[in-house]
Design a protein with these regions (language model features):
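Vicinal oxygen chelate
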Residues: 1-6, 29-77, 86-114, 126-141
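Conserved beta-strand-loop-alpha-helix junction that forms the acyl-donor binding cleft
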Residues: 12-14, 105
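Helix N-cap motif at beta-to-alpha junctions
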Residues: 14-15, 80-82
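Conserved active-site tyrosine of GNAT-family acetyltransferases
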Residues: 18-23, 89, 118
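Short glycine-/small-residue motifs
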Residues: 122-123
């Protein structure tokens, strides 16, 4: 299969608040907006990144699946300066902190916050892994 695009779609009844959150804190811009669906795009890098927000009661969702996302989802944001993002998002903007900033032996410096829907957001800077974890990577690091 040739994939032309791939992006998460968050099912939530908080369409407007969710779109505002990702625009204000993560630099996304609206590319399509209806009362039941918002398509967002972040063009700060190449390739650009997309995220959509959809009312779970919309007719395009199969009947048995029409419910808001409720846990079990983490969106990872890899950034150049995780410490600066921590300062901006946690210290200044006051977003909730679920996992304080720390280095992981498998090759990440990160912290975890969440969006208005309770979706976890893992803000990550890739760092060199420990020797033990370096062997687990397919490509040498």
């Amino acid at each position: 299969m040739k994939v032309n695009s791939f992006y998460p779609v968050i099912l939530t009844e908080q369409i407007e608040a969710s779109a505002k959150f990702y625009r204000e804190h993560f630099g996304f811009e609206i590319v399509f907006e209806a009362d039941w669906y918002v398509s967002l795009q972040n063009q700060s890098s190449t390739p650009s990144f997309e995220l959509a927000i959809l009312d779970p009661s919309h007719s395009t969702i199969p009947q048995g699946f029409r419910k808001p996302v409720d846990g079990g989802l983490i969106l990872n944001f890899e950034v150049d300066d995780v410490d600066a993002e921590y300062e901006r998002l946690i210290v200044k903007a006051g977003l909730p902190l679920h996992l304080d900033i720390r280095d992981e032996e498998f090759g990440q410096r990160h912290f975890i916050t969440s969006d208005p829907n309770g979706i976890l957001l893992d803000i990550i800077k890739v760092i060199p892994p420990s020797e033990a974890f370096a062997e687990s990577y397919v490509d040498p690091v």
